Amino acid sequence: MKTLLLTLVVVTIVCLDLGYTRRCFTTPSVRSERCPPGQEVCYTKTWTDGHGGSRGKRVDLGCAATCPTPKKKDIKIICCSTDNCNTFPKWP
């Protein structure tokens, strides 16, 4: 009887955990959204657009399975793994 009860508790915990999905801020709307299954990392990607920053700073927020790797040296990516941890950056 104890074994059956313990098994039911473990199965319940596993099922509840599998149903959870991360929430991250996403662009262009900058609102909190549920990430697709398997994407448990929130990221903030910032870069300067245009020649010499004439068009300003750009931001991309979203979800990923793993932290994205910058393809250029002037792209900065910050990753985190709690709900809504990728807030829009504050510019100096």
UniProtKB/Swiss-Prot annotation:
SUPFAM superfamilies: Snake toxin-like. InterPro entries: Snake_3FTx (IPR003571), Snake_toxin-like_sf (IPR045860), Snake_toxin_con_site (IPR018354), Toxin_cobra-type (IPR054131). The keyword ATP-binding does not apply. Expressed by the venom gland. It is found in: Secreted. PROSITE patterns: SNAKE_TOXIN. GO terms for cellular component: extracellular region. Transmembrane segments: none annotated. It comes from the Eukaryota. GO terms for molecular function: acetylcholine receptor inhibitor activity; ion channel regulator activity; toxin activity. Keywords: Acetylcholine receptor inhibiting toxin, Disulfide bond, Ion channel impairing toxin, Neurotoxin, Postsynaptic neurotoxin, Secreted, Signal, Toxin. Belongs to the three-finger toxin family. Long-chain subfamily. Type II alpha-neurotoxin sub-subfamily. This is Long neurotoxin 1. The lineage of its organism: Eukaryota, Metazoa, Chordata, Craniata, Vertebrata.
